[in-house]
Amino acid sequence: MPDWLAQLLITLLKAVLVAFALLTTFAYMTLIERRLLARMQIRVGPNRVGPLGLLQPLADAIKSIFKEDLRVTLADKLVYTLAPIVAIGMALTAFGGIPAGPPKSLFGTDPWVYNLDAGILALLALTSMGVYGIFLGGWASGSKYPILGGLRSSAQMISYELGMGLSILGLLMLVGSTSFLRIVEWQALNGWLILFQLLGFALFLVSSFAETNRTPFDLPEAEQELVAGYLTEYSAIKWALFQMAEYVNMITASAVMATLFFGGYRGPVFLEGLIPGISGWPLIWLILKIACFLFLFIWVRATLPRLRYDQLMRFGWKLVLPVALANTLLTAAFLAFGRGAGLWLLGLLSLAGLLLLFALSDRVRALWNTPTQRRGAETAWVRPLGGDG
């Protein structure tokens, strides 16, 4: 067998395995999320299908497959059908570039589907293209609520994609590469990048919630405002494909944060000298880090209310983008003038920037209000109880 054909078959096999792992994780993520939300809300949650409710994802899958696939009269049939395929296709493709271990550690092959020198840029491009599935699904439905949800998704993606890119630009300048593998190797030598880019991580985390359309940024499908947003006219397997795309994007965002800021598939450096062979558990470390971020996504959904649309846009353009730009300039200044002082200085500066944001939290909160609300807050007086003013 020619080498190129063998390599192609191996790549296809790895792609199938990654897709299977992601879709299986999605299925049980829905169950875990429902059970955790129920526990946080003092409920029981789904526990009737199978032992301890573990077959609930299978029941949901069977139900979605065999439900009637309704078609809207005014819908564009081709685009209406292709939109969920585009969404899930981009989500699955984006995850394939994230390394799950060192080179040649997966039965003599590389533990990734593809490895690009511009890996992080390719991933940002793929995740950005996923919004086309949402927008096209809303537009093709031929209904006002879906098109509003699609437009919201497009505006939200544009607003937070810039901040997300700038939030990791300082990290990329520090490492000197856009390859995921080299970023992990750099952290093995110098320490996790969360220590030196704390402000960038906070901005990337917020942008990840917005990019995945999760609470408090789930405006494209706001039930109280848009029925179900871009999902209003979808049912059966098409609706399930959109849900798959959302959860796969959550998993991808968690894997990216683990890789960029927490050492990726490598365990904590201080443990490598204490526990023999700990560096031989790359996949386990990556899964544990992804699980922590997925729990954070669920926790935030159970805790925070949804932002208004004007608050969402104002927060992205007036806070996330300027602070991300400031973090980039701070890192550039350190590389130009303070490199000799050591990386700890950059970590302290990043921590100081984050603490400054918390200290100015009242000013930050004012960005969420409209000009009329801000003027009202400035001129308000405490009125006596029961008085007319």
From Swiss-Prot:
Pfam families: NADHdh. InterPro entries: NADH_UbQ_OxRdtase_su1/FPO (IPR001694), NADH_UbQ_OxRdtase_su1_CS (IPR018086). GO terms for biological process: aerobic respiration. Its EC number is 7.1.1.-. Its main location: membrane. GO terms for cellular component: plasma membrane. GO terms for molecular function: NADH dehydrogenase activity; oxidoreductase activity, acting on NAD(P)H, quinone or similar compound as acceptor; quinone binding. It catalyses: a quinone + NADH + 5 H(+)(in) = a quinol + NAD(+) + 4 H(+)(out). It is a multi-pass membrane protein. It is found in: Cell membrane. It is an enzyme of class 7 (translocase). Keywords: Cell membrane, Membrane, NAD, Quinone, Translocase, Transmembrane, Transmembrane helix, Ubiquinone. PROSITE patterns: COMPLEX1_ND1_1 (PS00667), COMPLEX1_ND1_2 (PS00668). The chain crosses the membrane at residues 8-28, 78-98, 120-140, 157-177, 189-209, 255-275, 280-300, 317-337, 340-360. NDH-1 shuttles electrons from NADH, via FMN and iron-sulfur (Fe-S) centers, to quinones in the respiratory chain. The immediate electron acceptor for the enzyme in this species is believed to be ubiquinone. Couples the redox reaction to proton translocation (for every two electrons transferred, four hydrogen ions are translocated across the cytoplasmic membrane), and thus conserves the redox energy in a proton gradient. This subunit may bind ubiquinone. Belongs to the complex I subunit 1 family. NDH-1 is composed of 15 different subunits. Subunits NuoA, H, J, K, L, M, N constitute the membrane sector of the complex. This is NADH-quinone oxidoreductase subunit H.
